[in-house]
Amino acid sequence: MRTILLSFDEKWYPVLKRGEKIFEHRRKFCNEEVRAYLYLGKPRQQIVAEIGLGKRELLEDWLQQYQEEKEVADRISDFMRRNKFAMKVLWFKEIEPINIIEVQELFPELKIPISFHFLDKKPDVLKWLDDNKHYTGYQIENDFSNVGRDNICVL
């Protein structure tokens, strides 16, 4: 499984952490299951969690699947204005915040991603993060057995 550094909007972090946001939506994304270090931008500028993301799914396919349900199809269409894919958030593990500025001082080649970067291409950075992260003990694993129309394109 590949590892990425994923930029994430602070406003969505609480619902992700609570397990309410079970899909991540992006315009571009890799086509495989990944482990992601979650980076929150300004003002925090910290890596705060590790999450597992499932293989991408086309929102276009969801639109086909739910075309007979107007409310759901409208939500999907709205999300499609900004995104192309949805990925299941498989699990979430909170870590003690890691200041990105300190990481960049150690590894000046590390740039803050607009969306995401593959950390596998920066093995020294990945090793440092893996060796220096400290889990807080808070973690969740999302259950997708009862996912349905009410969970599609809501957060």
Task: Report the location of each language-model feature.
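Contiguous surface segments at macromolecular interaction interfaces
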Residues: 1-29, 45-48, 56-155
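Short coil-to-beta transition motif at edge beta-strands of beta-rich domains
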Residues: 28-38
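Short acidic, glycine-rich loop/turn motifs
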Residues: 40-42
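Binuclear metal-dependent hydrolase catalytic cores
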Residues: 51
